[in-house]
Each structure stands twice: as structure tokens, then as C-alpha cells.
Amino acid sequence: MQQDDSPKLFTERLVTERLFTDLETPELVEQAILRREGALSAEGALVIPPAPRGPCQRFIVDEPSTTDAIAWDEGNRPCTLEQFDALWDGVHGHLRQGERFVAHLHVGEDPEHYIPVKVTCETAWHCLFARHLLIPPARYNPSAKEQWKLLHAPTFDGAPPGEGLVIIHFARRKLVIAGQVAAGELHRALLAVQSFLLPEKGILPLEGIASIGDDGDVALFIGAPGSGRRTLAAGPGRSLVGATGLGWGRDGLFNLAGGCERPLLALPPRGAAPGFGTLVENGELDEGRRLDRSAAARCAFPVDQLGCERAGEPRHILLLCRDPAGVLPPVAILDGESAADHFLAGYGARAGLAEEGEGKPGARFAPGFGASWLPRSARVYADLLARRIEDGDSRVFVLNTGWIGGPAGNGGEPVPVEVSRAIVAAILQGALDGGEGTPLAELNLVLPRAVPGLDNRYLDPANGWRDPAAHRAAARALAEALGANLARFARGESPCAPARQRA
């Protein structure tokens, strides 16, 4: 029989192969369509239809390297080696029964502090998500580091019904994700790995974005999702670094991630629709294959267009807080210790609180401004922040990007973005570097006496309240809440309850 040596089309050779390694974006999109995992929108985005997404429980194997280092709580539950082995072996066997997609990626842009990871996925679209949110290197693992391995199996039936599991084994450098969970858990699990390892090297992992000016000055914007980080960091003549996670060490800032995951609703309504290569999870298409901008849809894409992988020491640090109480000023000055306290508190509006202030206002305290992938005690990261601020001689400010003049939904109005932009411009020009102002002792803040380009009536938050006494009462209540929250993180103590809940 004559052998057929003619070249095979990509789609033809897939018929005889079950393992696909390091496919590029177009190939993964093609595979996702062939496997009916999703469909293309009119603009070319890969749209994955809505599917059940259950709660995800993250476990970490309790072994010598983690026993006393992890802040054991509801977000980081301990499990045994036997439980990990059972899930790993089950998922490994499950994946070998069908086609699987492998990608060799890095977590972290830094040539010294990256970690290499082999990601094995059950679906093409999850592999595409991994390529977008992590870093496909030009050369994999050039320093020949010990490799991490991640298995991802959404249809594995060993997970609790309607839920998902993530288990991390630091000593073996392995992660396993099983069950119907949002794709973002893959990315967050690997950020948790870096966030455990980096502090041992004196590097602070954080959720933020940096901008670099034409003269090389660096500004770091830290805040919870929805606080306006990207909106305020972007500007004429400034390049961006980071979209999801950053590492801050002695040599400056570097990307931990290579892409961005955002709600579809967060994209400009009049901007270009997501195009080819963009992944839309929980998306729906109309008869014309146009995307429905639903609240559940999330898009993932690489951020090559940011143009920068690293930045030097930040000259200015801006902590962004969406204050639902309308108590905080639009801008205040912090020193390193007070900045660490505000970072520890992570005070802001609860997720989903409407910009218009509709509904009952609600606050939350999320250490690190809600970076759910920080597995150590929040005090570890706060102390690192204070050290980095001191070593870099950075100027620190807190900006209220929430409400002023009253609580959200009860007389308060959103801080105009024009006001926030004017404040950022003044900070970047160095107009507030002197640090002079009026102390607001109960909130551990200093009010600047003037901000160029900003009406002075905005500087004192009490000015916008109809009843000054109501503002004083609200400020006292916030100060007490901040104090009670910080009391959980006394220096040298773990912020978690001592009791451990096992898997």
C-alpha cells in the first residue's frame, strides 16, 4: 500500500491525535469550534455559551511548608495528602480518556522570578483562556527551573455536585482544578502560587496597574476591581504595566499575568466589539451573531497592547477606594504605615453596588483590596508594602472613587471622574509631594490644603453633606469599623481563626 506523504491540514491531523501541545490562538479557536465548545461572533470573538458555574472551594495540602505559613480560612482550607492524591489521580485518568490540550506557560514576566507551568486542559477554550491570562514565553523555562503542573477538568464528576474544587500542593508543585467553575479560577490559582512564593524573596504581589510617563516616572494604582484603576492609570503619554497582578521587588514592578479578564459590561459601550482571539465566557449571540452585553458575560484577552512588561520603583502610589459611606475625601495623603493599614483594611463598596447608588449601600473589608489569591496572612503583604514604600521613598495617596456628600443611595453622589482625573494629574506632576495638609486624625489621613485644577470645596468631605453632624457621625462609625477590622491583624498574629476546617 502506497504511503500518503502529502501534507495534512491542521483539521485533518486532529482526527488521529488526542494530545495537542502549545497550539496558537487561531488553532485553539478552530478546535473550540470543531468541538462545539463555542461559536464565533460577527466580529470574530470566541463565545462560550452560559453553563452552570458553581461555587469553588480552594484547598491547600497541609504539609511542613504550609502548616504555619498559610492563613487558613474559608478561602484557604487545609486538606490531606491522601485527599490530594485521590483527586489528582482521578482527574489524570479522566483527562487521558479524551482529547486534551497542553500549554507551557510562565507566571510572571521577571526572568528571575517567573514560574514555569505545564497546563493540561480538557477543553480548547480553557487552554485559550490560560494562554491569554498567563504568559506564553518566547522560550519556555530558560533557567531550567522545576516545573509546576496544573490539571483542569470541568466535566470530572468527582467534584461535589454543582461545585468545583481547587487543590494546591506546594511541595510537589502541582495544582488540580475539577468541576464546573468559572475559568478565572485557573488564573487565580496560579496567582495564589506566586503570591505564596514571592514574599519569601521580598517581593510584594498585589492587584494593581502601573503607568509610566515619558520621562520614566512610575505611578502605581492599587484597588479592588471596579475602583477605576485602569481608567485613571491611562492617559496621554503614559504606558501601562499590568492588568491583573503585579510583583513589586527591589528592582521595581513586573507583570505577574499576561492578560486581562473583565466583565463584558465594563468595556466601552460604543467601543469596538471584542474581535478575533478574544474569549467571551457566558456569552450569548443574537440571530445576527452579535454579542448580548449581559451582566454574566466575561471576556479574556492578552494585553500585548500595553507595551510594557516592567517598570521601575513607583514614585507615586494611589490607593483607590470606592467609599459607599461618602465619608472619605476625594484625595488624602498617607505615610507608609497608614498606607499599610488602609491596604490591610481593603475598605470599599461591596461588589455590584450600582454607580448610581441604587439600593442599600454596603461596605466590605477585603484585605489587599479583595485580591482573593493572597494565601498568607494579610499582615505579611501589608508589612511588605510598608517596606517597599520606605525603600523606594514613594509618595502615597488614597483616592475616593466612590461617593461624596452622603452615603450611596441616601443623598450621596458619585465622585465625578473629572475630579479624580484632576487629582491624578496633580499627583503625577508632583504638586502634592510636600505632604503638607490638615490631619484627619480619626481616619489616619491628611487632607491637602490645595490641589491644582480642583475646586477647594471638594477637599473637605464634610462640605458636601447637608448636615455636618451627620458627616461627623458617619466618620466616627467608619473609624470604629476600620479600627475593629485592623484589630484582627495585630502585628505578629495571624488574621485567621485558629480552627481549621478540613476537606
Regions found by a protein language model. Name each.
Residues 458, 463-503:
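Generic C-terminus detector
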Residues 102-107, 203-205, 398-401, 436-440, ...:
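Short coil/turn segments at secondary-structure boundaries
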Residues 73-80, 176-182, 372:
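Short histidine-centered catalytic/ligand-binding loop motif
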Residues 69-72, 169-175, 363-368:
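Gly-rich Lys/Arg/Thr-decorated short loops/hinges at beta-loop-alpha junctions or inter-strand turns
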Residues 2-44, 199, 207-224, 234-236, ...:
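Glycine-rich, often acidic-flanked micro-motifs
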Residues 228-229:
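Conserved glycine(s) of the Walker
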Residues 1-141:
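N-terminal accessory targeting/assembly segments
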Residues 145-197:
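Charged, amphipathic alpha-helical linker segments immediately N-terminal to NTP-binding catalytic cores
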